[in-house]
């Protein structure tokens, strides 16, 4: 997992990923499992990482294994730890996915395999975009409630009693975490 910031103009800066892959390429050998966990746009594992590793002349899924598995840690959260947070993984080939899942099964309670690295990359962007939108929404609702003289906390607590279709978010400063505000930018950039 390496940093994946945005450039000064708001484009994904994947230079850290490329540097890491260049280092791996110098020592790549048979039976190596490589898993990218850095948040990035769909296609990075296939179009960038795999493309750089092809220079090794080894065969993916046979000689070495390449997967994407989004980092899903919530620092400081005692309820959801590395062990009990399901791990999503998608490999370049079925053999890659299988070996990656085998590794993570030693660490986490549940591994969720998906059909491709692009799917796994998109999972992380959906999760964080969903969070970003809903935090923004609840902050707007808090402003409206204040203007209306309504207790936003009472509204949220009452809405949270609905057993489906509502997930509780609470208002506060900012979005929380460095990645939440920038992750939707990756998706926006890729779709251009």
Regions picked out by a protein language model, each given a short descriptive name:
Residues 1-192:
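Structural/interface elements that position substrates and couple domains in central-metabolism enzymes
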